[in-house]
Amino acid sequence: MSTQYLLDPTWYAERDRLNSLTQLYDPGTMALIERLGLPPGARCAEVGAGTGSVAELLARHVGPDGQVLATDTDTRFLDPLADATITVARQDVTAVPLPRGQFDLIHARLLLEHLPQRDDVLASLAEGLAPGGWLLVEDLDWATAEVIDPPSPVYNRVTGACREFMRSRGYDPEYARRLPRCLAAAGLTDVGAQAIAVQVRADAARGIPPWELLVAQLAPGLLAGGWIDQTDLAAFTAICRESDSVIFAPLMISSWARRA
């Protein structure tokens, strides 16, 4: 089993894939952060910050008196964002923990599900919270990943193969549903959670970028391992570009808890 993050930040379309996810999920993330009552001047950490879209939104929220630490193992998309409010750090959270007791908010989205060391990482994130600080973790649960209208066996076959291929590489497609219990086990209080399945309609020109680009990046491994064949891949891509295809994305489970 791999111990490394599965998806390659150097892949030619990785920024497009990440951007498509930010368009789906950033509004919900910020709505939750506002609900938690993050004040101006707060100290925040965005772990596995990707393109930095949430880090930028946090910087606007906390204002010039606040601080946002944006970390990732590859900071090519983050480096241009560094300024007086946003500090960019190349950091592997599985090896280097955040400073203890420093942050009013720590946020990680679509990260822990990929890490075999997820329980240890979650515990270290909890240690990074200042008293009263919030930890917000958001990951996908694949319970709705094969919901498509009109029904499509090949779409379901490729989606299932993708899920199980990633599982074989250390990904946990059911981790998100355990997050509330994991947050409580980390010694945090005021645990809460919500689950949302976003409906996505196919686009003839763009397809369904979050899922089409995920499968495209994983395609070499899927094909080489016999998880799917070229006919499956071509049919999946065609379905993603049929204008009458409507899917429900995997459940985004957002869980939060506070350090007393």
Regions found by a protein language model. Give the residues of each.
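Conserved alpha-helix/loop element of class I SAM-dependent methyltransferases that forms part
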Residues: 23-40, 57
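A short SAM/SAH-binding and catalytic strip from SAM-dependent methyltransferases
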Residues: 104-118
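A short glycine-rich, Lys/Arg-flanked "PGG" loop and its adjoining helix->strand segment in the class I
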Residues: 119-134
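Class I SAM-dependent methyltransferase SAM/SAH-binding core
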Residues: 45-96
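Conserved catalytic/acceptor-binding region of the Class I
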Residues: 136-204
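A short acidic, Gly/Pro-enriched loop at the edge of an enzyme's catalytic core
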Residues: 96-105
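Class I SAM-dependent methyltransferase Rossmann-like catalytic core
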Residues: 3-26
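Conserved Class I S-adenosyl-L-methionine
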Residues: 174, 191-260
